[in-house]
C-alpha cells in the first residue's frame, strides 16, 4: 500500500476535530470496492482485499467498528451522507510546460515559492502538474510509487472534486476547485498560472 498510516492518522485527527471526518465502505464484493475515510478537502480509498491491518485499525480507532458494505457515515453526527466521488478530468499537456518542470521525474514533489507543494507525473504524451496541500502530500509514499512496476494512475479533476493518486489498490484524493473558479489570491491558482501555457480541457 502506498499510504503512510501515521500521516493519514494525523489528517483524520484534524478532520475529526473539525467535525468533517467521514468513514465508509463500498461494496467490497465488487472489483473496486473498499474502505474510505475523508475530510473536508481530502479522501483516501483502499481496495477491500488490499486493506492492511494498520489501515483497518485506524478505521476502528476513529469509528469503533468496521463499516458494512454500502455504509457511509460522519463520525460527529452518525448520519448517512451522499457519495463524494466523481468528476470531469482535465490535463496539462507536456508541450505547454516549462522545461524546468518537464525535467522533474515521476512522483517528485517540490516546494514552490508560494509555499504549496507541486506534484508532477509524467506520462508518454502528457505531463500532469498540480499544487497540493503539503500535509496531504506527506501521506503518499512517493518512493514506493516510483519503485513499483505497476505505475499508479494519477489524474487531476475539476469542479471542487479531487486530485487522485493511485491504482487499483488505493488512491488519495485532494479536494480543490477548478483553476477558473479559484479566487485571484488562491495559492494553487498562482502556482498553476505560473506554468506557461496552462490550459484546461
Where do the language-model regions lie?
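Intrinsically disordered, low-complexity linker/loop segments enriched in Gly/Pro
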Residues: 1-46
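Short Gly/aromatic-enriched secondary-structure transition segments
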Residues: 48-51
Amino acid at each position: 500500500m502506498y499510504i503512510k498510516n501515521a500521516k493519514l492518522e494525523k489528517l483524520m485527527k484534524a478532520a475529526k476535530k473539525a467535525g468533517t471526518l467521514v468513514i465508509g465502505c463500498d461494496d467490497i464484493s465488487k472489483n473496486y470496492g473498499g474502505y474510505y475515510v475523508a475530510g473536508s478537502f481530502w479522501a483516501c480509498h483502499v481496495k477491500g482485499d488490499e486493506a492492511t491491518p494498520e489501515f483497518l485499525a485506524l478505521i476502528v480507532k476513529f469509528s469503533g467498528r468496521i463499516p458494512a458494505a454500502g455504509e457511509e457515515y460522519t463520525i460527529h453526527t452518525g448520519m448517512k451522507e451522499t457519495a463524494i466521488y466523481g468528476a470531469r478530468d482535465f490535463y496539462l499537456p507536456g508541450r505547454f510546460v516549462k522545461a524546468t518542470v518537464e525535467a522533474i521525474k515521476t512522483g517528485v514533489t517540490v516546494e514552490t515559492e508560494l509555499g504549496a507543494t507541486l506534484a508532477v507525473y509524467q506520462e508518454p504524451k502528457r505531463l500532469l502538474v498540480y499544487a497540493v496541500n503539503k500535509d496531504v502530500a506527506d501521506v503518499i509514499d512517493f518512493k514506493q510509487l516510483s519503485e513499483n512496476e505497476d505505475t499508479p494512475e494519477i489524474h487531476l479533476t475539476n469542479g471542487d472534486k479531487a486530485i487522485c493518486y493511485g491504482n487499483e489498490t488505493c488512491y488519495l484524493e485532494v479536494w480543490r476547485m477548478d483553476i477558473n473558479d479559484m479566487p485571484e489570491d488562491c495559492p494553487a491558482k498562482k502556482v498553476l498560472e505560473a506554468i506557461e501555457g496552462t490550459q484546461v480541457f
